[in-house]
Amino acid sequence: MGSVISAEIFRRYQQYKATGELRRKPVIGIVIEEAPRVLGKEVIERQGNNIYSTIAREGRKFNIGLIAITQLVSLIPRTVLANMNTKIILGNEMAQERAEIIGSASQDLSADNRTIASLDKGEAIVSSIFTKFAVPVKIPLFEEFIESAGLESEDTDDDMIEFYRVGLSMYRFAHLSDCHLGAQKHPDLRELEFEAFRMALDDALQKDVDFMIIAGDLFHSNIPNMETVKRATLELRRVREAGVPIYVNYGSHDYSPSSTSMIDILESAGVIDKVVRPIPGKKLGLEFTVDEKTGAKITGLSGRSRTLEAEYFMKLDREALEAEDGFRIFLFHSAITQFKPVDLADMESVDLNLFPRGFEYYAGGHVHRKGCYIEEGYGPIVYPGTLFGSYAGDLEENARGETRGYYLVEFTDRAREPEFREIRPAEFEYIECDVTGKNSQDAYHQIGREIAGHDVTGKVVMLKIRGELSSGRTSDIDSASIREKLESMGARVVQINRYGLSTREIQKVRVVESDVPRLERRIFREKLAGLDIRNRRLMEEGDSIAVELLRRLENEKAPGENKSEYEKRIIEDAGDVLGLDLGGDGT
């Protein structure tokens, strides 16, 4: 098995060198204990050169090293020993073996024969082509090494991991996205939304991260409620004062083409660092932001509406980005076509081939579900998902078991496997009632019996009522009394989803959807299908344009903004969506 794995590594690294990718790959050391079993003269004479002897001779050209451990040096061919540039020589009392060691050393050790025989535990001589003379070294016992570092044998695994992390200059960062602060209107949900944000920052600080990344949609609006901004700023400043930078990009919600976003204001105040900095030219160049402590290089693109995202990606100067060395993070706020969940097939996306290749980490946002994807030629492509949830569909997924949180990433010259850190500010309870075939009165009583069997104390309850009533109106099912009953049972928050409820007596627009943007899109699409529209763009993108226009028109007047300024901003936003230059005066 070891031979198969080593051969595959060697083959891939040969290929990386041929394609110019080798310098961005980590150096690999392959360790063989009892080395004569695979590198012995008899083995090679009987089987011919194997992958280990090949790596001994050629591996360094492809950033692969071989570490052979043995006391019986004489069993290994001189041709193999000669290609091992550094030898750590421990005590050996066998004269024949000492002779082979001395004969294959990079320096003249003929006067050290007896010294090698008398080397004690922890004593060694290093002979290497990289030094002018052999170097005596002292190797501490593992127990002494741990004690000198201030650790004891009973210390936890976390203590040991932290010790090695510091010793190996391993760094950490937290990757968050889609916090959507200010999305929730219900006071308790708004508090939980913020609590999730605070808990994530606290957890990341406790994990001693070196920096944080928020991959878009920190706020639910580009001009959020001022109380939301105040609380968020206090938390972000607390992180910054702890010596932890926060790197962000715009999401599709907190970007505005016509006015200053709250992201810009927070950057001006020194609370966060916006990392998307285009370089003008025929191709779209991107400037890297270098983290001062770790040397990590961060760049990327912000979220945009509709097809604008793909246009920006197509203009990218990928060749220049790929040529940059170091540990690179590409920050983005877009769905990737190859990784879209099946039920999100309608979501606009960007093809992976438009991304620069070879970055060590791809920090994604916009998709509200967590995911970590590995694709050849790319570092980990990671979506943390929404931190709490901005829509009813998100909260329903929470209640059905979807975990929310952020990713903790450790790295040296490459990223280790990202660790998902769950953040749970509240417990959820999911209740689903299918009332198909019931009249409205029977359906109401069935719902009452169903909820009575659930423990909802202190929980956020997501009640989904679906099915087609045989008679009666859907409004006959009294949501207010159902909510009161659940609250009397101790529920903290009650959300009732009736989108899937219909009746045979009345059928208007048929939709079965709980995610508000997708619900709006489906309604617009159904209405468009009934219109005689000759404009090709409206036929193909009409639903997307309508949803985006609706979202822009929902923006409230900002503090200090007078009526004419507000109207001008709304008109310019609408023009941006429609692809028109309205000039802010409606003309």
Curated annotation (Swiss-Prot):
Gene Ontology BP terms: double-strand break repair
Record's cofactor remark: Binds 2 manganese ions per subunit.
Residues reported in the UniProt entry to bind Mn(2+) 2: D217, H333, H366
EC code: 3.1.-.-
Assembly with partners or alone: Homodimer. Forms a heterotetramer composed of two Mre11 subunits and two Rad50 subunits.
Record keywords, A-Z: DNA damage, DNA repair, Endonuclease, Exonuclease, Hydrolase, Manganese, Metal-binding, Nuclease
Function (record text): Part of the Rad50/Mre11 complex, which is involved in the early steps of DNA double-strand break (DSB) repair. The complex may facilitate opening of the processed DNA ends to aid in the recruitment of HerA and NurA. Mre11 binds to DSB ends and has both double-stranded 3'-5' exonuclease activity and single-stranded endonuclease activity.
SUPFAM superfamilies in the record: Metallo-dependent phosphatases, P-loop containing nucleoside triphosphate hydrolases
Name this polypeptide is given: DNA double-strand break repair protein Mre11
Listed cofactors: Mn(2+)
Enzyme class at the top of the EC tree: hydrolase
Entry annotation: catalytic residues: H253
Activity regulation text: Nuclease activity is regulated by Rad50.
Organism: Methanothermobacter thermautotrophicus (strain ATCC 29096 / DSM 1053 / JCM 10044 / NBRC 100330 / Delta H)
Pfam families: Metallophos (PF00149)
Family label: Belongs to the MRE11/RAD32 family.
Location of region: Mre11: 170-587
Cystine pairings recorded for this chain: none
Superkingdom, taxonomy of origin: Archaea
Region span, Unknown: 1-169
Binding site for Mn(2+) 1: D178, H180, D217, H368
Record carries keyword DNA repair: yes
